[in-house]
């Protein structure tokens, strides 16, 4: 019975993003990716969502065959070409392949990628294909070696999004924040997901020279249109730190958004800015009322009698309330759930860390309040400057309320972990999730600019999406 519970623990585990992502590189000439047919010179500003992170990592090419023995994945998939911005660029350029180094507008990261890309194991757990501070991640932290992480080191990217950056950091950050230090392993605290990601800055921006901000890089490209999607990490860093990180003031969020838009406008670019989803609806956050049913179901599946499983789950819920302040309005993260199940497997009391394992009711309420205020600030900045607003918040909220996206009902796609919208980290979208977001941007831009850019074929993307149920 214990073995069966352990087997489930592996299945339930999800992870922290590597604490070693970073940047660095040597200078290079500005080689601009040729457009195929489009006359639009589009640049992407943002964080990991615009960069195309999936399953804790950033990578520009597949790893084949899969180096993890017995993994159900025949290969480890590249992440960057599947991002929403890469798909948007492709649709603007007659379907050109954003993964082709000869023409790609992306700062393609060479395998095994930056971060710790998650891969399923034969036993049903998760592992990664790179160590947290292996040579690839370590190279990313030094300007002289950062471009060694790239497949296309001589190409100046048009997607200048830096994973982990906040709205304010896009205006001012010019260096990695910390040296490469070993983070938790593939099954660890989710606080590692966003705190080190901005250390990707040098591999992405090194072509522009030293001490360059993301905004400065975008302006240097002389865009006609710039997409801006920032603010997600302001929320994640607050929620996943147990509230220890001082939250960004909403007024500052609005001022920074306005500054970014106005500087891009002054450089001759139209701006398309997106607001933020309700962060706690991401699959990595399990609402407290769902904890008992999940644990009960998994323990029954592992072989425990139904009455014992239900009583055990009730005890877990009681401990969450009394010890951690996680009541009906709180959340347990996927990493926290993994720890709970691991403790149950060896008949021990579980211990959770405030940074990354759970979100108490009070912190959840504060996070949602900030979420609302940030969206109001971003919306006001767009209105004051005439920027086009992509209402990602409304799209996701409506889809969650509807039970998901009707791509292949009932299998895909919902917003729960493993439901098809998210990749294995429960924070960054799957191929299908990114494709739906690309279409939201395309449709908004077509309406705003009276253009006819075709939508991405989401059904075709879904058909080969390794992260979506079939």
Give the residues covered by each predicted segment.
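Bacterial N-terminal signal peptides that target proteins for export
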Residues: 1-9
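Bacterial N-terminal signal peptides
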Residues: 9-18
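Bacterial Sec-dependent N-terminal signal peptides
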Residues: 17-40, 452-470
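Catalytic nucleophile-elbow at a beta strand-turn-alpha helix junction centered on a G-D-S/GDSL motif
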Residues: 40-58
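Active-site-proximal beta-strand/loop segments in catalytic clefts of secreted hydrolases
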Residues: 45-48, 228-233, 240-241, 274-278, ...
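Conserved SGNH/GDSL esterase-like catalytic core that processes O-acyl groups on lipids
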Residues: 58-255, 259, 463-468
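A short helix->loop->beta-strand "cap" motif at the edges of active sites that frequently abuts
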Residues: 266-270
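Mobile gating loops/cap/lid regions near enzyme active sites that modulate substrate access
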Residues: 286-428
